[in-house]
Amino acid sequence: MAYDLAKISTTALMRPAFEAGIGFTRLDERIARSPVGSGWIERMHFLDACASLWIDGELVHLEDLVLHDATRDIRTPTHELTIARDVLRTRRRIAAQSPDWPLSTEGIRTLRQTSDINPVGVEAVEPADVIRPAVAIDPEGEGDDGNDAKDLPGVDYAAIDAVLARSEAAIEDARRPGRAGANSWAAEKDPLVYDLDWDEDARLVEWRSVLRQAQDLPAVLQAIVALDAWNELSVLQHAPWLGRLLCASILREAGITTGAHLAAINLGLKTIPVDRRRHRGRETRLLAIAHGLLAAAEIGMKEHDRLTLAKTMMDRKLDGRRTSSKLPELVELVMAKPLVSAGMVSKTLEVTPQAARRIVTELGLREMTGRGRFRAWGVI
């Protein structure tokens, strides 16, 4: 399958594309100077990950993703939730790297391997001798961790396990007699899960060829064309979400978004009707993507204004507090997370769950779950 760039008419795309570029630039400038900038970025990671799954036809609740990321699950994680976690971690990884890394050969190879850990749409088939660690569920629903001695702060054990697993797989592949390079990748795939005739390498080469042809276009138009090409070529069988993150990386590499700000384009695309996003006519699809990017910039600006107002109101409650008060730390936590549980608050602030609930009450956060057994709070 080839994607012919010569047949694209950019006349109708110019206005929405440039408006989207202006919107992202204004948003990026505001985020860079905002006191809630870091919290806004972290929140958008969560929101965009959930929106990405929604676009792919899966539903993941925001509160489940937040608690799963904080290892405070109240139930066994679903397959969709683990995919959302991968999207979340991939966004963070891209944002933490240099702007040119995601689209480099090494970057795409690494991100492609990461995205292949949890296939989308089909349950991963594992060998019988693989033992997955059980998820510890707190009977009270607050997820208090009784094994803090092993969990060092700032250490992502899941990422370490993933690297070790890929390293072991690479070693085993190298030791296998008659190894045929890229062909060995297809030989390892279970035909129940993967279409072995689906040549992802060739499709990826074709997609990168489209990127080279579009390199003289304005950055936003590049991202629009790249995303449509990724969808039409169906580059990866089980990770369509990776293409949207790579297209957001195009905007970051061009300087439209800077620093750790990775455009949350899934939030914007979610507002576009599916019949326009998947229309048979290419011009309709490109316009839908352009309007989705513009919507993403507008949603980001509204979310920033909402967080700024919320922080201003909460800061007023800090007046006259002791210097040892935990309220300022709670404000920072609430700004960075869409919702928090008593377990998350107690771990971050190093207080008991009872003290965490009392501090939350003092700050006046809104209870989000409406449950008696499990409670979580956030900023509305």
Swiss-Prot record:
InterPro entries: DUF1612, HTH_DNA-bd, Y4cF-like. Keywords: Plasmid. It holds the Pfam family DUF1612. This is Uncharacterized protein y4cF.
